[in-house]
Design a protein with these regions (language model features):
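Solvent-exposed coil/turn segments that connect beta secondary-structure elements
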Residues: 10, 54, 98-100, 280, ...
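Short beta-strand elements bearing conserved aromatic residues within extracellular beta-rich modules
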Residues: 12-14, 304
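Functional-site microenvironments in short loops/helix caps that host divalent-cation chemistry
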Residues: 95, 160-163, 171-296, 300
Length: 362
């Protein structure tokens, strides 16, 4: 697929690789007109794409070749603005501003909102990261825990909550830890077994925030690429080091599908909070499923990643919208009569006639 690729600054090196390959193929330096492998289709032709230049952060993404061709046909250059290393947030990727649309079951009717550019963690927060939070007194600094904490509908004090947020040995820490630390040789595994409140406290300590569903899904997908991301992600039944499954998101993040579930800010009508992406023991469909848990839940796959945003208060309020999903109460329905059933059933009947197939060309 022929496409026009430009960057700011010019002179950046362009590479691509097939999704199941570890080898990057060099294409040339910007500006350039080149051909990239793929299929002229919105649903097929995905490749990993990378632009690099000394003293600038690499731009990497999962991109759709059909999308690239459509831009080329419209005479729109693929323009990539690289970020100087001096302005890069450590271990984070920049997501450009623009419209954020949700390709998530039950949430497709939510408004499209426009976001400013923002930074999101390239990897899930690791055990080693969370250990620093604990070692620097994260569970002892009440100012990091400014959200109301409730258990079974009852508001509990911060001191009482700290007695709940303990590891398997009774020390403060994730439910999957013991003796105040993680399992041996798992420093680069995602921290899991944390409640929403623990994730939120860590984000405050790190001078970041948890992502809204809009910030999270914009970083995860351009246009619903779950069919190529989910099968290549960690839904294996056991956790893995972050980045071990070599599949990129739309803007170069790892493990947004699988490995650890990831807490978000959005409240749900039932008191839950959004938790996204699915964990290593979930089905692949969790990546695009509208899922939530009670914020005090500390299930073994509950993890998170953080963002740094520059949104105004109004935009953040829109992104952090209350999720009100419809739940049908089947017990409230009464059986219909046979007459009504037969009318509906008749809509699905067809004439069982011979197909009479013919071979036109062998």
């Amino acid at each position: 697929v022929e496409t026009d690729i430009r960057s700011k600054p010019e002179g950046a090196k362009v590479y691509y690789k097939h999704l199941d390959s570890n080898e990057w193929t060099y294409v040339g330096e910007t500006p350039l007109v080149t051909r990239l492998p793929g299929v002229n289709s919105w649903a097929r032709g995905y490749i990993n794409f990378k632009i690099t230049k000394d003293d600038y952060a690499d731009y990497t993404s999962l991109t759709n070749v059909g999308f690239i061709k459509s831009l080329s046909q419209q005479k729109v250059s693929n323009f990539y603005e690289l970020t100087p290393l001096a302005k890069v947030q450590k271990n984070m990727v920049r997501v450009p501003g623009g419209n954020a649309r949700l390709f998530v079951s039950e949430l497709g009717d939510l408004n499209v909102i426009e976001l400013n550019s923002y930074w999101i963690d390239k990897y899930e927060v690791t055990n080693a990261d969370f250990q620093k939070f604990i070692d620097e007194g994260g569970y002892k600094n009440e100012s990091l825990w400014d959200e109301i904490i409730n258990q079974d509908g009852t508001i509990i004090s911060w001191n009482d909550a700290m007695e709940l947020f303990i590891d398997q040995s009774g020390l403060n820490g994730p439910s999957t830890w013991s003796n105040g630390t993680y399992q041996q040789n798992q420093e680069n595994y995602p921290v899991t077994g944390v409640s929403w409140f623990e994730a939120n406290a860590y984000a405050k300590w790190a001078n970041k925030t948890l992502p809204s569903i809009y910030h999270w899904y914009k970083a995860a997908m351009y246009w619903g690429e779950s069919s190529v991301i989910s099968p290549r992600s960690n839904f294996s039944g056991v956790p893995s080091e972050v980045g071990n499954y070599n599949v990129l998101s739309a803007y170069g993040c790892y493990d947004m599908a699988g490995n650890a579930r990831e807490w978000g800010t959005n409240p749900h009508k039932n008191g839950n909070r959004s938790i996204m992406g699915g964990g290593y023991d979930d089905g692949t469909y969790y990546f695009t499923d509208n899922f939530s848990q009670h914020p005090i839940n500390r299930y073994k796959t509950n993890g998170f990643r953080c963002v740094i945003t520059s949104e105004d208060t109004k935009t953040l309020a829109s992104a952090d919208t209350l999720i009100q999903t419809f739940q049908r109460d089947f017990y409230s329905y009464k059986p219909i009569s046979d007459e009504v059933f037969n009318i509906y059933n008749g809509m699905f009947k067809y004439d069982s006639a011979p197909i009479n197939t013919k071979v036109i060309k062998d």
